[in-house]
Amino acid sequence: MLTKNNSLLSRLPARISFGLKISNKNVNSTYSNVASAYCEGATYKKNGVSRLQNELLSQKTNNETIPVPLQHFIRPAAKHSIFTQIKGYGERSRPEFERPITLEELKSLDYESGKHFVPQSFSDTFAYLIVKGLRAFADLYFQKDYVRRVVVLETVAAIPGMVGGMFRHLYSLRNLEDNGEAIKKLVLEAENERQHLLTFLAVLKPNVLDRMLIKLGQFLFFNGYMVFYFVAPRTAHRFVGYLEEEAVRSYDAFEEEILLGHIKNVEAPRISKDYWNLPEEAMLIDVVRAVRADEAEHRDVNHKMADSKSFSLAHNPY
């Protein structure tokens, strides 16, 4: 109980005392759900409903009118609209997929088929030969089973972007400077490759042998590429550029196998329709074309990063 003459009230911080209700007429004073936060915007209980809930309920549901701190409380209205809500890590790699795209538009996307960067130096040649060796192994192991091929290889395809983004992120932190949009570009690339994996997992689940290969491949490739990037980051980007060239070739062959009837053209998974804004009638071949366009974008991004003669982690080509 607080008395009328109690000096404690005068010493209470303003941000706490606003939660006390003092009666000047009565000797006794009552509490009205004392605020528990010491920062601005603190939530406190009043009549069983939090202040934050009251603010949230009073706002319009249009994301453009809701203050940024409250936007993450709003759930998407559409059933499968999560990819349209996420910004940053959920963005598509190509602007064509930021809006609904028709199957004809998808088919006519210019991904510059056959585009190849001719090695200009010893490091470029070194990166190219490594990729050709990896391609030979993949061809020998998977043959023309392209669904299995992409499920396994997309598990390692998502590693380079994350490693490159991590190194640039650490550079920015230790040098106390902003090195631009390259971090976001690389991390987005990694997330985009992960979406490729999740899409094809809806078509085919890997067998026991493939799962063992995936675990071993992740261990070897992650550690190997991390050392590679630490020693020669420019060459590492050239290496990824060549990897993506081979990925485009693989998806060209994947598309051809579907057209020839060697691979069943099943309905596109739900996740692919949401992620690439594909129409409801989209099929597997349309997913292949969308993924191929992404790979072409990654090819160009990594070759562009490697093209700088004065390459550094501070360099930002975007």
UniProtKB/Swiss-Prot annotation:
Its EC number is 1.10.3.11. It catalyses: 2 a ubiquinol + O2 = 2 a ubiquinone + 2 H2O. It is an enzyme of class 1 (oxidoreductase). Its cofactor is Fe cation. It comes from the Eukaryota. Fe cation 1 binds at residues 154, 193, 196, 295. It is a multi-pass membrane protein. Signal peptide: none annotated. GO terms for biological process: alternative respiration. Fe cation 2 binds at residues 193, 244, 295, 298. Alternative oxidase which function may be to reoxidize reducing equivalents produced by glycolysis such as ubiquinol. Belongs to the alternative oxidase family. Found as monomers and homodimers. This is Ubiquinol oxidase. It comes from Trachipleistophora hominis. The lineage of its organism: Eukaryota, Fungi, Fungi incertae sedis, Microsporidia, Pleistophoridae.
